[in-house]
Amino acid sequence: MVTKVVDLRSDTVTKPSEAMRAAMAAAEVDDDVLGADPTAQRFEAEMARIMGKEAALFVPSGTMGNLVSVLAHCDTRGSEVILGDNSHIHIYENGGISTLGGVHPRTVPNNPDGTMDIHKIVAAIRHPDGAMYYPTTRLICLENTHGNTGGKCLSVEYTDKVGEVGKSHGLKLHIDGARIFNASVALGVPVHRLVRAADSVSVCLSKGLGAPVGSVIVGSNAFIDKAKILRKTLGGGMRQVGILCAAAYLAVRDTVGKLADDHRKAKVLAVDLASVETNMVFFDIADPRITPDKLCQVLEQRNVLAMPASSKSVRLVTHYQISDSDVQYTLTCIEKAVEEILSGNAKFERLTNGTTTNSYGH
């Protein structure tokens, strides 16, 4: 008998549904590097339509999607991108924009709601007269939802204002929209409207949407033409990629409608309901006798997987394969785990499911 494991480490842990597996097996495929895979072409066209952009491109990962997007906009070494100091691109993507693209990150503090102050963005834009001394600002990056602030949503109004700032200074705007559909559902705003101001958007298919692999980037035809070359340069060109796109199509079609339920379950897990906007719950641990590492170890012994978010906090992420009974079981296990640790009866050992490592942007 297989023991049920409640896996709340991330929404990246979902397993392909039977429908996805069947679609992958039946997918009509050809060589996508040659531009001939019909399933990939149909999926990319559908994603461009949904996102309100001219074209789309499937890429193996969100990290590659963001990297390709930044390099497409900043195609001259010595370019500079303005982005949040607590953003996924800046913290969790191996510094790829600088190590591979020669693009300098100019950070602006992220507020607790994931935004950056508009006036600080403007102040970070390099003046052309300083070209002898400074990099050239070419791009602004936003993240929606914002992972490190607990899945906070950036509003249409805010995004539009940043877009206006960019246009007035001749800059492009890229949105790291790994969980953009979560933001769309939480805000009640169509996703195409949410990203209207952006010149490019990356969308993760394997987080909240539940596909097994991949991300998609969207933008103008000219942007996607450049992105295709960069994807190949970075080793992201794949052959019969329609197998993956078939699963991704079902993820977009079938899972977006379930995201509101994920958000509801996250609120059940939360102590402070106002702090939860989407599917991510962060909770701080005040008692010094309980560390995130210890708590996650004891939870794993009860078949609940969570992940430390920092030295004092734990993160739980709901997804469509978490049931209401899973949520209630988790709450019970957290209560019992705390009691066990405080009583001195807990046993600690290094476990194997990644629960004792930082979330690292998952």
Please give the residue ranges for each predicted region.
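Conserved PLP-enzyme active-site core in the AAT-like
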Residues: 2-322, 326, 330-362
